[in-house]
Amino acid sequence: YQFNIGLSTSFTGEDSLDIAIDSGSSSLSPMGTTMGFDSGTKLNVDGVTYTFPVGGATMVVGDSTDISSTFTGACLYSAFTDATPDDCGTGNSLGVAGKGVTASLSYAFDSGFSLAGGISSPQSEIVGNSADLYGVEAAYSADSYGVAVAFVNSDNGYLPETTYWGVNGFYSFDLADLSVGYETEENGGTDKS
């Protein structure tokens, strides 16, 4: 079984403090994957995130928060199971998670263009000797189409760094939507697609 609860509150009406609490068993799901919070029956705080405006931009800080939480993206596909990703195949770039303490900022222009960036670290010291992760994204969305591109770098601490480039896009027809994505990975000088 699994039990999730999301708590949300605001102090000013323009901000949001969100806390996710999870509990569940460690048995395999019908798709053959274990739940991400295999901890028996105890309650675990899965994430604490605070979102607030900074001028015309939106800032997100938190623990166990995705860097991509402020990324616009351009993928309309939504899976009905947890085993199938919702990121059009760009989960390491446009759908990048965080490694612990995270800060992310985005700005949306009136023209449909948006910019976002973030940094995350598994330690309390961001940009130290730990395996920090940072990424930037640019996106454009109109009524019936959109495109987004992202760059993510994971310095992996003392190991060779890994970089990701991802692009995804969508086009909306009258009866259906088409979403596509492509991502590349370079790990210590070795390219993968």
What are these regions (language model features)?
Residues 71-75:
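Outer-membrane beta-barrel and related beta-rich outer-membrane complex signature
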Residues 24-26, 76-81:
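Flexible, surface-exposed loop regions and adjacent strand-edge segments
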Residues 133:
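Active-site substrate-binding loop specific to GH73 endo-beta-N-acetylglucosaminidase modules
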Residues 1-62, 66, 85-119, 130, ...:
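Beta-barrel outer-membrane channel/assembly domains of diderm bacteria
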Residues 121-123:
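Right-handed parallel beta-helix
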